[in-house]
C-alpha cells in the first residue's frame, strides 16, 4: 500500500474483525432470547457455535480472490505479477518506482537470525528447567510462572543484532496489545456484567454496547492514523486504557460498581479501539525488513496468541481466587491491566519509531542506523 494511505488501509482489517464480532454479539443475544438459562446452558450455546459455520465458509470462499503481496511476488521472482498488483493501488509510474524500491530492498543483506535462535534457545532451556523444578516442587502455577520468568531472564542477555532488536520490539508490541486486558473485556464481558449485578440477557445486551463502541472508535482510528501518526495514538490509547482500568478496579474494590463501572469499560474499549486495536497491526506491518518480514511477522503473531492465552487463562484465576476476592473484591485483575497500560505507553515512547509517511524500505534503513 502507498505510504500515505497504508495506515488507513491496514486499519480496515481491524474494522472487519470488530464488525464480525459485533454481528456475533447480536446473534448470541438473539439465540439467548429463545429460551431460559437452563436451555442456554444445555442447547443454546451449541447453536452459538454452529452459527459460526456460515462466516467460516464465506471466509474460505472469498480467500480465493485475495492476491499475493507484491513483496512476496518479488521475492519469488514474479515481478510482472507484482507490478500488476501494485497497479491496482496506484498509477503505473508510481507502481514502477515502488516495484524498484522493493527489488532494491531485497538486494541488501538480511539481518542475521542466529542471535534470535540463540535467544530462543536460551529462553526454551530456562523455561524447561524452571517448569520442571516448579512442577517437581508441586507449584500449581508452574507453567505461567516458568513462561514469564524465563522470558524476563532471557531478555537480560545482550542483544548484538538489530534483527533481534526488531523481533523483540515486534514480540513486545504484540504482547502488550494483549496484556492490557482487551480480550478479558471481549471474552468475559457477560460474566463481568453479571459480577456487577446484571442478568444474563442484560449482560449480553451490554456486550453489544461494548461492541458498538469498539466499532465506532475503530472507524475513528482509520481516519486519524495517517493524520496524527502511530505513536501519538498508541501512547494516548494506552494511557486512556490504564486510567479506566485502574478506576474500574477501584469501583470493584470499594464495592461501588454500577453505571460508573460500565462507563469505565466503555472508555477502556474506546481507548483500545482508537489505538492498540488497529494501529498495532499497522506497526507490525511496517517495522519489519522485507527480507525477514514473513518469518518475523509469524513470530510476532504467535507471541500475540501466547499472550492472549495467558491473559484469558489467568483472568478467571485472578477473578475467582478466594484470597484476592476477599481482599480486593475482584479489583486486582483490572489494576494489573491498568499497570500494563502504563508500561505499554512507556514502551511505545522509548522503543517504537514513528512510521507515518515512511516507505517500508525507509523503515529498514532506520533499524540499520
Regions found by a protein language model. Name each.
Residues 95-104:
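Short, well-structured alpha-helical segments
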Residues 1-90, 106-369:
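Alpha-helical transmembrane bundle of multi-pass membrane proteins
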Amino acid at each position: 500500500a502507498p505510504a500515505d494511505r497504508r495506515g488507513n488501509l491496514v486499519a480496515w482489517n481491524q474494522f472487519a474483525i470488530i464488525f464480525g464480532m459485533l454481528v456475533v454479539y447480536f446473534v448470541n443475544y438473539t439465540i439467548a432470547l429463545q429460551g431460559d438459562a437452563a436451555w442456554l446452558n444445555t442447547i443454546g450455546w451449541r447453536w452459538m457455535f454452529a452459527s459460526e459455520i456460515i462466516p467460516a465458509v464465506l471466509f474460505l470462499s472469498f480467500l480465493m480472490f485475495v492476491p499475493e503481496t507484491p513483496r512476496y511476488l518479488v521475492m519469488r521472482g514474479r515481478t510482472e505479477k507484482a507490478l500488476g498488483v501494485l497497479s491496482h493501488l496506484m498509477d503505473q509510474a508510481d507502481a514502477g518506482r515502488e516495484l524498484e524500491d522493493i527489488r532494491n530492498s531485497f538486494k541488501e543483506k538480511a539481518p542475521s537470525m542466529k542471535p534470535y535462535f540463540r535467544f530462543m534457545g536460551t529462553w526454551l532451556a530456562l523455561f524447561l528447567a524452571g517448569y520442571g523444578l516448579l512442577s517437581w516442587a508441586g507449584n500449581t502455577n508452574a507453567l505461567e510462572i516458568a513462561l514469564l520468568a524465563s522470558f524476563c531472564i532471557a531478555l537480560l542477555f545482550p542483544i548484538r543484532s538489530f534483527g533481534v532488536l526488531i523481533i523483540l520490539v515486534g514480540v513486545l508490541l504484540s504482547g502488550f496489545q494483549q496484556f492490557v486486558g482487551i480480550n478479558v473485556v471481549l471474552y468475559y464481558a457477560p460474566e463481568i456484567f453479571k459480577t456487577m449485578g446484571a442478568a444474563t440477557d442484560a449482560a449480553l445486551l451490554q456486550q453489544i454496547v461494548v461492541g458498538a463502541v469498539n466499532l465506532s472508535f475503530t472507524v475513528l482510528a482509520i481516519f486519524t492514523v495517517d493524520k496524527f501518526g502511530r505513536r501519538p495514538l498508541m501512547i494516548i490509547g494506552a494511557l486512556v486504557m490504564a486510567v479506566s482500568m485502574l478506576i474500574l478496579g477501584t469501583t470493584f474494590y470499594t464495592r461501588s460498581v454500577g453505571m460508573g463501572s460500565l462507563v469505565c469499560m466503555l472508555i477502556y474499549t474506546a481507548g483500545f479501539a482508537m489505538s492498540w486495536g488497529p494501529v498495532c497491526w499497522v506497526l507490525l506491518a511496517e517495522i519489519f525488513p522485507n527480507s525477514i518480514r514473513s518469518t518475523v511477522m509469524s513470530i510476532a503473531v504467535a507471541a500475540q496468541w501466547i499472550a492472549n492465552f495467558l491473559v484469558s487463562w489467568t483472568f478467571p484465576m485472578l477473578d475467582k481466587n478466594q484470597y484476592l476476592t476477599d481482599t480486593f473484591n475482584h479489583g486486582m485483575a483490572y489494576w494489573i491491566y491498568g499497570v500494563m497500560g502504563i508500561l505499554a505507553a512507556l514502551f511505545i515512547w522509548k522503543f517504537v519509531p514513528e512510521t507515518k509517511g515512511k516507505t517500508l524500505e525507509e523503515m529498514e534503513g532506520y533499524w540499520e542506523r
